[in-house]
Amino acid sequence: MSEFWLISAPGDKENLQALERMNTVTSKSNLSYNTKFAIPDFKVGTLDSLVGLSDELGKLDTFAESLIRRMAQSVVEVMEDSKGKVQEHLLANGVDLTSFVTHFEWDMAKYPVKQPLVSVVDTIAKQLAQIEMDLKSRTAAYNTLKTNLENLEKKSMGNLFTRTLSDIVSKEDFVLDSEYLVTLLVIVPKPNYSQWQKTYESLSDMVVPRSTKLITEDKEGGLFTVTLFRKVIEDFKTKAKENKFTVREFYYDEKEIEREREEMARLLSDKKQQYQTSCVALKKGSSTFPDHKVKVTPLGNPDRPAAGQTDRERESEGEGEGPLLRWLKVNFSEAFIAWIHIKALRVFVESVLRYGLPVNFQAVLLQPHKKSSTKRLREVLNSVFRHLDEVAATSILDASVEIPGLQLNNQDYFPYVYFHIDLSLLD
């Protein structure tokens, strides 16, 4: 499953034993894979400031998740015919999202823990706001390009009455630069081909004999040329209409046709450059983080390997990719990493608010093995940690019991700190 539960309990002896009981039960019952989730010590400040920060982090969490989902969808749209490979591009620091979450390590360089918590949160908020602003401008430019290209493509996909003719006709099909003669294009229904050949010369005076030629046809009819004197154009149009022949209003302008062809070629080139299908396939299965080793303490599977890549490897894999796809990959990674740091901050703040000072709690990441086991997993957690809040635990088991002074829906409150992480970003 791509679902994770991030929980915390006090770090005293009694609750560490409760965590061990939880791990034993969930392991034996095959309910979840559990991993300790390392969160550094932050400058706490006042409890009042933490209350305000808790609300701000909740909003930032929602915003960050929305942003990475939009970015994931943008990758889908850019890749178009290669949608099956989208997941390979949605990485965090060069590894798949599940590996990054289960091997999470706080980025001390990017978010120094010596700063006040409010400063750390502000740094993340500004980073995400900038990514969103860039995303809007880049996707707007791409969508404009895509729309312009689609409009041009529609012109070449209609029937003979509406489609552009610049890719069909050629200079040789027309009498050009003549003071007296002009070549018209006439759409003739397929059942009327024979009638056209027999009658076009007599539809009006001054039609050049044997001047008709079939240029192209679709399932409904054909496009024929006919050359005549300019002064009988209107008379010819009238007679043609009476015989179910339609004169297509078109005059060969070499410069205009060349301009239209160049515009189509330019748009196709610009769109292709945003995502090139020749991009190098992403490598999988690398087992080291080069510049900073991933340090994890698995509760359920101590032999589970960490995965990672060097920055140089990630850069080499980006060769051949268009600028928009490359930007989306890099900034999706940045936004996702920021999002998981927000989760860590929320656990820290809520744990201090709920368990008090001095700071002493243990965070654990649980990955339910299957959807059908989540109800049983929740029952195990509520049973193991019910001592943390007897009133809340009782109300969870009995929905009719209200918690005095607690405004949350009882179904959203648990005796332990709990946050949900959903990695199903393309659903």
Swiss-Prot record:
Q: Which GO terms describe its biological process?
A: positive regulation of Wnt signaling pathway; regulation of macroautophagy
Give the UniProt keywords, A-Z.
Answer: Hydrogen ion transport, Ion transport, Transport
Provide the free-text tissue specificity comment from this protein's UniProt record: Kidney and placenta.
The GO cellular component terms are: cytosol; extracellular exosome; lysosomal membrane; vacuolar proton-transporting V-type ATPase, V1 domain
Q: Which domain of life is it from?
A: Eukaryota
What Gene3D superfamilies has UniProt attached to this entry?
3.30.70.100, subunit c (vma5p) of the yeast v-atpase, domain 2
Residues annotated as region Disordered?
Answer: 292-319
Tell whether ATP-binding is among the UniProt keywords.
no
Say yes or no: keyword Ion transport present: yes
Q: Which GO terms describe its molecular function?
A: identical protein binding; proton-transporting ATPase activity, rotational mechanism
Please explain the role this protein plays, according to its UniProt record: Subunit of the V1 complex of vacuolar(H+)-ATPase (V-ATPase), a multisubunit enzyme composed of a peripheral complex (V1) that hydrolyzes ATP and a membrane integral complex (V0) that translocates protons. V-ATPase is responsible for acidifying and maintaining the pH of intracellular compartments and in some cell types, is targeted to the plasma membrane, where it is responsible for acidifying the extracellular environment. Subunit C is necessary for the assembly of the catalytic sector of the enzyme and is likely to have a specific function in its catalytic activity.
The UniProt entry's sequence similarity note says: Belongs to the V-ATPase C subunit family.
Q: How does it assemble?
A: V-ATPase is a heteromultimeric enzyme made up of two complexes: the ATP-hydrolytic V1 complex and the proton translocation V0 complex. The V1 complex consists of three catalytic AB heterodimers that form a heterohexamer, three peripheral stalks each consisting of EG heterodimers, one central rotor including subunits D and F, and the regulatory subunits C and H. The proton translocation complex V0 consists of the proton transport subunit a, a ring of proteolipid subunits c9c'', rotary subunit d, subunits e and f, and the accessory subunits ATP6AP1/Ac45 and ATP6AP2/PRR.
PANTHER family on file: V-TYPE PROTON ATPASE SUBUNIT C, V-TYPE PROTON ATPASE SUBUNIT C 2
Supply the name of the protein.
V-type proton ATPase subunit C 2
Taxonomic source organism: Homo sapiens (Human)
Origin organism lineage: Eukaryota, Metazoa, Chordata, Craniata, Vertebrata
